[in-house]
Amino acid sequence: MAPQLLSSSNFKSLFDSVDTFLFDCDGVIWKGETLIDGVSQTLDLIRSKGKNVVFVTNNSVKSRRQYAEKFRSLGVTSITQDEIFSSSFAAAMYLKVNNFPKDKKVYVIGGEGVLEELQIAGFTGLGGPEDGEKKAQWKSNSLFEHDKSVGAVVVGLDPNINYYKLQYGTLCVRENPGCLFIATNRDAVGHMTDLQEWPGAGCMVAAMCGSTEREPIVVGKPSTFMMDFLLQKFGTETSRMCMVGDRLDTDILFGQNAGCKTLLVLTGVTSESNLLDKGNKIEPDYYTSTVSDIIKLMESP
């Protein structure tokens, strides 16, 4: 069925059929450090109608705590970290539910958010931002040393990725017996600033795939791994959830894989022409220009 433009004729049936709205963040709630117009009022209005509001982001640079701080800094003060599910959190939870040995370490190609979530889960993380200035040099009769106790390499969005990190992660995956290769997500690009799209974690993951000749375990969207935690917290059926996102291949596919209703907004990486292109195979149930359209539709007679 072709995606429906959200309108006064179909909005009420969608809203009444949903208990929990799942929102992506980049390109939906904000662009870089700029809140998208009308978002705060929309979230308050949805909550006032007795609905749950949850945030499911593939951006692993921040931890849940840091995302809650970002919401507050942008003037959205009602959000707690328990309502935020990030791919940094998902990476730590994947290790926890799979009984990753506490005596093994985790090498991180990514941001502080992954390291913080690993620490909260009881794991020892290495790498991250502190390896951003290190250099790998080719020297005759010299070995690049790496920690043999690393049992997992987590790769996420890393604005400071370099050759040192790639070599370190590659050696761990290829030479440490049983070492896991985990990707927070494979987004090609993202709205890291308000005016432009920037290379996403998919670029870093692709580099590691090339050097290790391995495919990663992906814990972020469109994988439904995080959905298990959402169901535990809210105890509602996925059919009573609606995923609101700006990406077809992550947000909308995640919602479809989990059995949720799906709503695409056009404030992020997907344009209306992308959506309606005959070559597009991923179609949301509904689409609209921006999240704040919900206010107008809710107030319409």
From Swiss-Prot:
EC number(s)?
A: 3.1.3.18
Query: What happens when the protein's gene is inactivated?
Result: No visible phenotype.
Instruction: Give the CDD domains listed for this entry.
Output: HAD_Pase_UmpH-like
Q: Give the annotated active site.
A: 19 (nucleophile)
Give the GO cellular component terms, alphabetically: chloroplast; plastid
Keywords attached to this entry: Hydrolase
Which reaction is this enzyme known to catalyze? Answer: 2-phosphoglycolate + H2O = glycolate + phosphate
Q: Which GO terms describe its molecular function?
A: phosphoglycolate phosphatase activity; protein serine/threonine kinase activity
State the function annotated in the UniProt record: Dephosphorylates 2-phosphoglycolate, but does not contribute to photorespiratory metabolism.
The family assignment reads: Belongs to the HAD-like hydrolase superfamily. CbbY/CbbZ/Gph/YieH family.
- Stated name of the protein: Phosphoglycolate phosphatase 2
Q: Which organism is it from?
A: Arabidopsis thaliana (Mouse-ear cress)
